[in-house]
Amino acid sequence: GDSGLRSFVSVQGSLCMFPIWKYGSEEQKEQWLPGMAAGEIIGCFGLTEPDHGSDPSSMATRAKKDGDRWILNGSKRWITNAGIADIAIVWANTDEGFRGFLVPTDSEGFEARKIQNKLSLRASVTGEFYMDDVEVPESMRLPDAISIGAPLSCLSEARYGIAFGAVGVARDCYNAALDYQQERPQFGKSLSSFQINQIKFADILTEMTNANLQAMSLGRLKEDHSIRPHHISMAKRHNCRVAIDAARTARAMMGANGVSTEYSPMRHANNMESVMTYEGTEEIHGLILGQEITGIPSFR
């Protein structure tokens, strides 16, 4: 598995299909969701901008009402699937506040570019797109998306999935290191027979189990409809840290061979650098938890 593939699926489901399902009209759901579920229509989620990442409420993208249509101008950056998407979920500022729009990527004035030379999530297409007087009809506005809370709710859905994906990363790194050490002789016995390495395996397994339990608890909260954003922030923050620590430890347990593309831990470590950044950085999730604990929003 690879976090790049999980990112593609996460964007398609949590960031594109979810807002249509939750905030869209019945006509929009019928038009877009079947094709997206079948993989025949690819979506991307346009929230992050070149100058606005952790503070989406300051976004510069604007949508202006002109009769029965909207005119969109602005740019979005670090967008998964940009360049291959058929439809973009675009979040923009309007005179009435934040709104969401369905923007076909073949619209006149819409241009997407792929971001090159990434060292992370190389299996995922990442890009940016620009809108220069892009026109969409009123029927392409998500009617129930009427505040910044709408895109943030989509991020909560994606973060929920990340909490589980991070456990998969840790497990693959654990298994890769264990297989390697069981078969690698050194000083007349396998690397896995040395005390220091057994302790490292015990530490990875313990933290991985803790992360898995937290993800399972998150799932139960979601099924009970009692899940709240700070629950998701805690799991995303914790489990991503567990995953990247497991990847780095596993890489080190393979010695120089660990930097080879033959083995997965270093690839996972590179990918997790991105995963720890998108859908809210580790620090932002710490502040979300801090607000829940103290009642004081430190970032406002």
Task: List where the protein language model places each region.
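Well-ordered alpha-helical segments within folded domains of soluble proteins
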Residues: Q12-M17
